[in-house]
């Protein structure tokens, strides 16, 4: 799909849909009023007969009445009665696209506000709504295929709007990259392939280094390597660097991602029902790769590190067993009670490596870590755990701004008893009570004096069904927007 910015007097044409806004109570925007007048009040009559109220995200899609150069007209509700906020424009553009994407029209003309920032945000919403992962489909009914090939956004100054869209386009590219990683089947996206795709981002100016099992063994990463020892696919540690600050020696920020490219549970094997979804157990690593893509794509003025721990958790004769004891890079020993609590074992070494090598300002890890977070928070919030109030507040604010919501949960020392082991320094699981919290407490043992936050994104990495028009069913790309906003608002010089 192609994005174009066009003058405000552009007509939709015979094969296009026109989208305009309506406020709460079905009050028409200036663009909608003009369309209504051109049709002799036909839009107002359609509203009266269609129970359209102008509620946020509500759409009314009709065949274009006489008087308009268009095939269809889409009214999109945005609530309120005054100025339309950028978020509302983004959602309205996405809703309009969803309303007509398979209607047969080949163009969608968005007249949602003429200033450059509004037009840019509309383009961003449409771009995200157009995401579709169907590369392996060889047959599909024509009426189910997306027909919209071009989205034209009306702007008072199309050149200025295009300029305003550039950083959002870079962010959209990064979100799509992350969604594609999560959507790929595990026979395609194994650790080596994931690492290769990360390496491909060097074209954006990133530096990418890949450590294999031999290098990790020399570093003493027994915790991470134990997870992957049952797979024929070699585990990988990917280090991504973006040095965008004026001072290249300035202390970087760091993101660490869990990348279990497929999780059978290992010897503690999962039930067959739903196991296919475990292809997205690398959603944390996909988010980290995505935010590094975004920072490089928009040339962010910050030094940033992304570290991806990539493994497959498979059961074979060489697989890790319940009861095994492994030694992490930190020197701490771990009794593996359950091989399906593997993500924290990967992160233990990845976190330690990151802080020891790069001495970052802070570390944020992202992981589809626990099913317990879904029980706690449902599918609208990710869990936030942190040793630093300031970092937590910045993350919460960024999440609210980008509709990637977080809820902070505690890390009470009293719960550490649940992960005590009689034969090692700790065990990797603490039982059913407070499962997300004890997982966070486990990770905290591998953080040595660095401000740190852990985002448990198991609840939000995959949405089906999705209620957000910018997130089609499936991979969300959760974390890319959130962390990009965090950097832009708080850490760019």
From Swiss-Prot:
GO molecular-function term, one example from the UniProt record: manganese ion binding
Subcellular location: Cytoplasm
PROSITE patterns: CYTOSOL_AP (PS00631)
EC number: 3.4.11.1, 3.4.11.10
Positions that bind Mn(2+) 2: 258, 263, 281, 342
CDD domains: Peptidase_M17 (cd00433)
UniProt-annotated binding residues for Mn(2+) 1: 263, 340, 342
GO CC field: cytoplasm
Catalytic activity as recorded in UniProt: Release of an N-terminal amino acid, Xaa-|-Yaa-, in which Xaa is preferably Leu, but may be other amino acids including Pro although not Arg or Lys, and Yaa may be Pro. Amino acid amides and methyl esters are also readily hydrolyzed, but rates on arylamides are exceedingly low; Release of an N-terminal amino acid, preferentially leucine, but not glutamic or aspartic acids
SUPFAM superfamilies registered for this protein in UniProt: Macro domain-like, Zn-dependent exopeptidases
Top-level division of the source organism's lineage: Bacteria
Family the entry assigns: Belongs to the peptidase M17 family.
NCBIfam families given in the database record: PRK00913.1-2, PRK00913.1-4, PRK00913.2-2, PRK00913.2-4
Name of the protein in question: Probable cytosol aminopeptidase
């Amino acid at each position: 799909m192609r994005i174009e910015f066009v003058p405000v007097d552009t007509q939709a044409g015979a094969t296009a849909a026109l989208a305009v806004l309506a406020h709460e109570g079905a009050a028409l925007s200036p663009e909608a009023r003009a369309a209504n007048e051109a049709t002799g009040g036909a839009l107002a009559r359609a509203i009266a007969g269609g129970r359209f109220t102008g509620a946020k995200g509500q759409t009314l899609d009709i065949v274009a009445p006489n008087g308009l150069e268009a095939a269809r007209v889409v009214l999109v509700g945005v609530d309120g009665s005054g100025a339309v906020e950028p978020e509302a424009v983004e959602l309205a553009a996405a809703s309009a696209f969803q309303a007509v994407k398979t209607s047969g029209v080949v163009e969608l003309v968005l007249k949602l506000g003429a200033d450059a920032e509004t037009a840019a945000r509309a383009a961003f919403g449409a771009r995200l709504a157009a995401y579709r992962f169907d590369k392996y489909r060889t047959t599909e009914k024509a009426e189910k295929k997306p027909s919209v090939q071009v989205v034209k956004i009306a702007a008072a100054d199309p050149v200025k709007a295009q300029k305003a869209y550039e950083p959002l386009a870079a962010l959209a590219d990064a979100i799509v990259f992350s969604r594609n990683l999560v959507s790929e089947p595990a026979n395609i996206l194994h650790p080596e392939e994931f690492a290769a795709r990360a390496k491909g981002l060097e074209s954006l100016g990133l530096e990418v280094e890949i450590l294999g099992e031999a290098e990790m063994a020399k570093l003493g990463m027994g915790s991470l390597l134990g997870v992957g020892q049952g797979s024929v696919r070699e585990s990988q540690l990917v280090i991504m660097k973006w040095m965008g600050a004026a001072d290249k020696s300035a202390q970087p920020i760091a993101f660490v991602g869990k990348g279990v490219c497929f999780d059978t549970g290992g010897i503690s094997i999962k039930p067959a029902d739903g196991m296919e979804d475990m292809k997205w157990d690398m959603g944390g690593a996909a988010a980290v790769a995505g935010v590094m893509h975004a920072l490089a794509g928009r040339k962010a003025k910050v030094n940033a590190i992304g570290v991806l721990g990539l493994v497959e958790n498979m059961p074979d004769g060489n697989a890790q067993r319940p009861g095994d004891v492994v030694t992490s890079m930190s020197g701490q020993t771990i009794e593996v009670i359950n091989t399906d609590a593997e993500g924290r074992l990967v992160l233990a070494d990845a976190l330690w490596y990151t802080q020891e090598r790069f001495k970052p300002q802070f570390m944020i890890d992202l992981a589809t870590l626990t099913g317990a977070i879904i029980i706690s928070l449902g599918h609208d919030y990710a869990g936030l755990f942190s040793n630093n109030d300031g970092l937590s507040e910045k993350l919460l604010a960024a999440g609210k701004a980008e509709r990637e919501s977080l809820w902070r949960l505690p890390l009470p020392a009293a719960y550490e008893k649940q992960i005590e082991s009689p034969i090692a320094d700790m065990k990797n699981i603490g039982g059913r009570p407070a499962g997300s919290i004890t997982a966070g407490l486990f990770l905290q043992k591998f953080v040595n004096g660095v401000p740190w936050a852990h985002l448990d994104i198991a609840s939000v990495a995959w949405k089906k069904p999705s209620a957000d028009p910018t997130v089609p069913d499936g991979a969300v790309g959760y974390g890319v927007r959130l962390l990009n906003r965090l950097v832009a608002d708080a850490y760019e010089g």
